Amino acid sequence: MYRRATSGVRSASARLSSSLSRIASSETASVSAPSASSLRNQTNRSKSFSSALRSFRVCSASTRWSHGGSWGSPASLRAQARNSTPVMEKFERKYATMASEHSYKDILTSLPKPGGGEYGKYYSLPALNDPRIDKLPFSVRILLESAIRNCDNYQVTKDDVEKILDWENTSTKQVEIAFKPARVILQDFTGVPVLVDLASMRDAVKNLGSDPSKINPLVPVDLVVDHSIQVDFARSEDAAQKNLELEFKRNKERFTFLKWGSTAFQNMLVVPPGSGIVHQVNLEYLGRVVFNSKGFLYPDSVVGTDSHTTMIDGLGVAGWGVGGIEAEAAMLGQPMSMVLPGVVGFKLDGKLKEGVTATDLVLTVTQILRKHGVVGKFVEFYGEGMSELSLADRATIANMSPEYGATMGFFPVDHVTLEYLKLTGRSDETVSMIESYLRANNMFVDYNEPQQERAYTSYLQLDLGHVEPCISGPKRPHDRVPLKDMKADWHACLDNPVGFKGFAVPKEKQEEVVKFSYNGQPAEIKHGSVVIAAITSCTNTSNPSVMIGAALVAKKASDLGLKVKPWVKTSLAPGSRVVEKYLDRSGLRESLTKQGFEIVGYGCTTCIGNSGNLDPEVASAIEGTDIIPAAVLSGNRNFEGRVHPQTRANYLASPPLVVAYALAGTVDIDFEKEPIGTRSDGKSVYLRDVWPSNEEVAQVVQYSVLPSMFKSSYETITEGNPLWNELSAPSSTLYSWDPNSTYIHEPPYFKNMTANPPGPREVKDAYCLLNFGDSVTTDHISPAGNIQKTSPAAKFLMDRGVISEDFNSYGSRRGNDEVMARGTFANIRIVNKLLKGEVGPNTVHIPTGEKLSVFDAASKYKTAEQDTIILAGAEYGSGSSRDWAAKGPLLLGVKAVIAKSFERIHRSNLAGMGIIPLCFKAGEDAETLGLTGHERYTVHLPTKVSDIRPGQDVTVTTDSGKSFVCTLRFDTEVELAYYDHGGILPYVIRSLSAK
């Protein structure tokens, strides 16, 4: 089905670059250039921040790049948002795109317009006359253009450009580069803590005697409020409005704070609740592909505080997820330090078979890439099969980059991209400019022309014709199950020991049935019964083909007299208002409604755990039993405990299959042999009887999806709704903290901060707070969903007069460190080896042997001034780019995490918070070394940061006499400088305050 090969990219001894903070020193800060000057020794690490403030010069800004049409662009909408609120301070944004002294001014070239005139100037890659460029992956060419555009031999040197040009050699050597994205995108779960940090940083800068207004984004920042909605109401015509009203009731304080931030900080656009999902809005509207700033052209690029920011890669825009602390630094002019990545070339051939969806393809690709190993790498797709994939199909694959572990899943711009830009309302002139620029700069793929062979780190190949219908689960996105094998796989999961593919249900209990009464009618639940069926998530609701496919399945089922059982919690949460428009035009929305798939809101719901409560009768039937109910959703993640506390089995599926499983009422079914229901005349109805043909879907999509829908949806996107407009936000540079607030609280990170960095911290005789196995996710570390009534966070809230109905979710309270510290490691499905396999958010306090909540145990250690560490297995911190998964452990007093391997973003977040990430040597882990977690650990690091090297060996000793060697996972000199300062944000504050 697919082929793997290793390319001839040459290997050499790893040589770490030592560039910290090529901080911009020109009169205006660069939009997308790396900016860090070399740090060769401790003097530079400790002193460079004194000159760093030059990069944080607040720039006045010009109008944001327009889509070119008369409808509202991000620029005009930002202006509307400011003009509609009296307290808003008007400003102009300037995009500084060129360094004052430029090493590559000779290749600055004019891009002519057809018929005369020019679009503007750009740095021409072909003008370098370097044959290596033609072999570079397209994703790497974006990094190259950025380095060239900003090269002045101070911010970025010719040596940096050479590293990227020589990618075939340097990509194997852990070479460090700096990168500045053109913009930053946030959602509210991560955006609120970002604003809390920025507000707190203003206080810290003021306390150090400097001007707090220096803390201001220097690049465009878009914050889309999409994570706060919960499915409290479903299966009713007014569900969306009721959920929106309850969302505002729960989050009034947070939303008021966000509204304050939109006026207090320059360069920030807040998209109000009820507008859509951040990544779908980014894809359909915010994505530029190419910036045209005052006649200067350069590629769009973006980082976001959500791991699925990668969805924009499907549009040919370089984008990936980062932690909130990295995003904050990027906003403030700090370069992103990254290791120049390897790029896996993934060739697609053939075409998808009849009945196979883009969801089936992405689940297949996820499994292949997860097996291949792509952590820390770019994946670039190419081949003749690309012409068979719509832009929405590509975006679906790019969206799930975090699930297959890659930094990006990149699709270079081609004709399909241009057609999508036109479909979504970008003007013809804008699309023409984008095509002209990318063709001129060797960044456009034309499959009608002979293809230049590009070099990749390794190669994969997939014949699209081999992809078959499938779902993934029950606990991980990459555990793909062919649909034809699902029944057998389900029974194997019941049999298997507890694990990612097992529930250990005794044979004699596998046929257990729980009978109950639902609205006075008899009902029953057994293992595999579907209790949640959700068409949700930007992964699939951005794709008209699968959405129309789901509606057609619902219509055909209704026509045959089939109906979803009333106790199944069905929901439809589109990622943008456009979905509602084309479902209405197609006439198929009514069919979804008949099957219970009413629109419940426009945002992230079931996919992130905002699924709401089950019906009390259903919940009571499950509670106190060993029944394993199932959820089926069209999302991108199904980690245990994420979707809903009572659905222990969670499967990812295409929207049409979500409808099919809802009709069947169980995952314990063989769709080939067993019916999904019975007609009124007693005849069986099979999945094949309701499944639409590809041609049928394509015809409806062509008729129903129109450019005018995108224009009308986005031209008023910042106008919000009456609930948003009624919010009254203060107007002030500094935020007035309310000590009694349980949503917004001043964090303790910068209190008693001194002007000089503290240097490395000793980790001596530390206790093990937690001992984990493999695949501990950020959901385990810092859950986003419900606050359990017996948790430390619940006790904290109740002590402050908050009743359980108003707890809201952990995600909604990320602006309050006191709640979030108590919520760290509070996932009810967490497994801690110190408790010998017992499941739950507890641990053993080693000195006393007491079983305590993780928070209470950590508090005891902190009170006694005893350090703590964490032991972990492979893939520690996988999942969402959740900065609280690093902030929380810091507040609990964790000094180091020793793991077999780390997920990319989480490792970076740990480094950004000053927690030491350490990796066991290959073939070793806590178990092979005989570590139980009851030992005390000392990490032997030099006391001067100048004596520490990125990636060096570090010896760890225990009080039992055992010692072992780990690899220090501070990967760059930049991260060592952050560690020296106690984290990235203290580094930035000292940089600004040193003036």
Curated annotation (Swiss-Prot):
Cofactors that this protein relies on: [4Fe-4S] cluster
Domain of life: Eukaryota
Role played: Catalyzes the isomerization of citrate to isocitrate via cis-aconitate. Contributes to oxidative stress tolerance. Involved in acetate assimilation.
Enzyme class: lyase
CDD domains: AcnA_IRP, AcnA_IRP_Swivel
EC number in record: 4.2.1.3
Short name of one Pfam family: Aconitase_C
Gene3D superfamilies, per database record: 6.10.190.10, Aconitase, domain 3, Aconitase, domain 4
Catalytic reaction list: citrate = D-threo-isocitrate
Subunit structure: Monomer.
Description of what induces expression: Slight level decrease after 3 days of iron starvation.
Cross-referenced InterPro entries: AcnA_IRP_Swivel (IPR044137), Acnase/IPM_dHydase_lsu_aba_1/3 (IPR015931), Acoase/IPM_deHydtase_lsu_aba (IPR001030), Aconitase/3IPM_dehydase_swvl (IPR015928), Aconitase/IRP2 (IPR006249), Aconitase_4Fe-4S_BS (IPR018136), Aconitase_4Fe-4S_dom (IPR036008), AconitaseA/IPMdHydase_ssu_swvl (IPR000573)
Disruption phenotype: Reduced mitochondrial aconitase (ACO) activity by 20 percent. Increased tolerance to oxidative stress mediated by paraquat, a superoxide-generating agent. Altered acetate assimilation leading to lower levels of CO(2), CHO and SO, and higher OAs (organic acids) accumulation, especially fumarate.
Protein name: Aconitate hydratase 2, mitochondrial
Entry keyword Iron: yes
Functional pathway: Carbohydrate metabolism; tricarboxylic acid cycle; isocitrate from oxaloacetate: step 2/2
Keywords: 4Fe-4S, Glyoxylate bypass, Iron, Iron-sulfur, Lyase, Metal-binding, Mitochondrion, Transit peptide, Tricarboxylic acid cycle
Membrane spanning stretches: none
Cofactor details (free text): Binds 1 [4Fe-4S] cluster per subunit.
Tissue and organ distribution: Mostly expressed in roots, leaves and flowers, also present in stems, and, at low levels, in seeds.
Transit peptide: 1-83
Localization annotation: Mitochondrion
One GO term (biological process): tricarboxylic acid cycle
Residues annotated for [4Fe-4S] cluster binding in this entry: C538, C604, C607
Any one GO CC term of the record: chloroplast
